[in-house]
Amino acid sequence: MAKLRNKDSTENWSHKNDYPIEEVWNTYHTLARFIVPRLQAFKALEKHGYCPDFKGMREWNCAIQKMIDAFELMKYANTYSEDEKRTIEQGLDLFRKHFFNLWD
């Protein structure tokens, strides 16, 4: 996606918004940095159950780890190897599919 840079709009950004322009330009990095520690905490939580799509807690935690791995890769990098792209795709697919199961 091409960035449209208007000097007036970027100079006064922080005066008009509650977050830095860099967090908006790199929204997926920002979201990944926000999501990773929460998924890690959720995985470590002594949960009372697991997503019904999985056979047990171990399998559910494995899926959560795949989500974590995907977001870890997306926290800072801009380019990815083919293996990293597959890891990201798999983790994001799991995150999307099981988003509403991320509760206890």
Where are these regions (language model features)?
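Long, non-globular targeting/processing and low-complexity regions
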Residues: M1-D104
